[in-house]
Design a protein with these regions (language model features):
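Short recognition helix of helix-turn-helix/winged-helix DNA-binding domains
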Residues: 1-59, 77, 105-106
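Winged helix-turn-helix DNA-binding recognition segment
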Residues: 40-102
Length: 106
């Protein structure tokens, strides 16, 4: 196995371990974060990750738009993700992940 790949996989585990310590996050937050980390792993980037709503919903097994929007919005409010939407159908939106919660609100 490639050493770089092992480092990235270790980093994913580190991110998830930190997220799991936050009592404000529930299973829906965690599966969305895991889906984002999975896409980042595929893209070879942990910071700026290109995402689409449909792909995140598929990977996280969230089947309804209200549930997806509720928990994705809360992740933004908590400061775990910074979302930069792309209004162009040919380009994916971008998510920037943070290891620690940037906001104490919520």
């Amino acid at each position: 196995m490639n050493q770089t790949k092992t480092k990235m996989e270790d980093s994913i585990i580190d991110y998830l371990a930190l997220y799991m310590e936050d009592p404000k996050l529930n299973v829906w937050h965690l599966v969305l974060l895991a889906a984002i980390l999975s896409l980042g792993h595929e893209q070879g980037d942990r910071q700026r990750i290109r995402v689409s709503r449909s792909k995140l919903m598929q990977l996280s097994h969230i089947n309804t738009l209200p549930t997806y929007h509720k928990y994705f919005k809360q992740l933004q409010e908590l400061g775990y993700v910074k979302y930069s939407p792309s209004y162009h159908p040919g380009f994916k939106s971008e998510v920037k992940l943070f290891k620690k919660r940037l906001s104490q609100n919520y």
